Regions:
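N-terminal, positively charged/glycine-rich alpha-helical extensions of SAM-dependent methyltransferases
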Residues: 1-25
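Conserved alpha-helix/loop element of class I SAM-dependent methyltransferases that forms part
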Residues: 26-47
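A short SAM/SAH-binding and catalytic strip from SAM-dependent methyltransferases
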Residues: 108-119
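Conserved class I S-adenosyl-L-methionine
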Residues: 139-164
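Core SAM-dependent methyltransferase catalytic element
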Residues: 182-214
């Protein structure tokens, strides 16, 4: 997928959502960042948090207990017209493959429904591991689908977590069915375990909490 086409598709999607919603909602993000990973809000106390592929909704607006809350998105500058300039969280306009931050800058790095949107997943994972401090946490949630789409050019599989080794270890992993169309968070909240004995081709959702060891 050409970069320009992908950018246009992403921006068109968010403009259509704003038209449909009036104002882009973000009320479910606290739950999305905590419940699926077995965490409480207090886990984010005084933490430096980076959300990869944050989009324009304000994914970290809820986290006013964090020391630093930054959203990274290659379209962050364009999202100002969608209202991000009114948010309290900070934004960095850059791709995951080139995170503009020193090594170990963050206590928590999250990628919720974004790692399949990148252009180079191996470069992205390398950067995520670099940006999180030793002992820090990576929160990962992603759709697993059979075919690429204009905005999701990367096809991930259940063995995705192997790519985070040897620096990181998976502490908590869930394989879930995608039981709701559209908003993947609703399927995660539903928590239906993925039946690997069912041979039917379908979406799945991988949820994992990883820790950087070295």
């Amino acid at each position: 997928v050409a970069v320009a086409d992908k950018t246009l598709a992403e921006l068109d999607y968010w403009k259509s959502r704003r038209s449909a919603e009036g104002r882009l909602a973000n009320h479910w993000y606290e739950r999305a960042f905590t419940e699926p990973f077995g965490l409480k809000r207090e886990f984010f106390d005084a933490k430096r948090v980076l959300d990869i592929g944050c989009g324009p909704r304000g994914s970290l607006e809820w986290a006013d207990n964090a020391a630093v809350r930054v959203g990274l998105d290659p379209l962050a500058d364009l999202y100002r017209e969608l209202g991000t300039d009114q948010h309290k969280m900070s934004y960095l306009s850059a791709p995951c493959e080139r995170i503009p931050a020193p090594d170990g800058s963050f206590d928590i790095v999250s990628t919720l429904n974004s790692i399949d949107h990148v252009d180079d997943i191996d470069a992205c994972i390398k950067e995520i591991k670099r940006a999180v401090r030793v002992g820090g946490t990576i929160l990962l949630m992603t759709d697993l689908h059979e075919e690429p789409t204009p905005t999701e050019p990367v096809v991930c599989s259940w063995d995705l977590l192997d790519r985070f080794r040897p620096e990181c270890i998976a502490v908590f992993v869930r394989h879930l069915e995608k039981v709701h169309k559209g908003n993947g968070h609703e399927s995660v909240f539903a928590g239906v375990h993925y039946d690997h004995t069912n041979p039917a081709t379908r979406y799945g959702i991988l949820v994992a909490l990883l820790q950087r060891l070295v």
